[in-house]
Regions:
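Oxyanion-binding/catalytic loops of NTP- or PPi-dependent enzymes
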Residues: 1-184
């Protein structure tokens, strides 16, 4: 049973990539407005590669070719985490809101399962560990669990025999509004 739903629909992996882009541009004193679209796309791709490099390392390198010159930064995970504090704070708010809505205390949570691609980031996992006071369950692929959930929901909508025993009870995650039209 789902007791509460909360989230930030405007927060995701791209936001964490953008932080790396901004760190790189700042370090090399590059004005983003002076870059052409191709160079911006190249920097973005290299920031994404750099972000993925943190999966198994404390530092990651971002190397970009800008106007024929190779510009390189070695970024430390702790510096990256400090630069992501605003984003991590945005993760905290929906967690706190859903716990409050469900009337659940942090100490009552038995297990934390991370869902979605951004939860593979070590800084997100560390943040969640500190918030909940325990390590999250990492035995489930956070991308696959989304796909399995979507497939299960689709099978339920199609009334597939394989999922006939599954019942999903949800809260309404959206605010409801009413419009009144007067013809006077």
């Amino acid at each position: 049973m789902i007791s509460a739903v909360a989230g930030d629909n405007f927060l995701g992996g791209e936001d964490f990539t953008t932080v790396l882009e901004q760190m790189f541009l700042r370090e090399h004193e590059i004005d983003e407005d002076t870059l052409d679209q191709k160079t911006r796309a190249h920097i973005h791709k290299q920031a994404e590669i750099c972000k993925l490099g943190f999966a198994d390392a404390k530092t990651s390198v971002m190397k970009c070719n800008i106007n024929g010159e190779v510009v390189e930064s070695e970024i430390d995970i702790d510096d990256y985490e400090k630069s992501c504090q605003v984003l991590l704070g945005r993760i905290r708010k929906p967690i706190e809101r859903s716990l409050k809505d469900a009337n659940i205390k942090l100490k009552d949570i038995e297990e934390v399962i991370l869902v979605g691609g951004s939860t593979k980031l070590s800084i997100v996992r560390r943040f969640v560990s500190r918030l909940f006071g325990r390590l999250p369950n990492t035995s489930i692929n956070p991308d696959e669990v989304v796909a399995v959930g979507a497939a299960t929901q689709a099978a339920m909508k199609e009334r597939n025999e394989a999922v006939k025993e599954i019942i999903l009870t949800d809260v309404c995650p959206f605010t409801l509004g009413t419009e009144v039209v007067s013809r006077r």
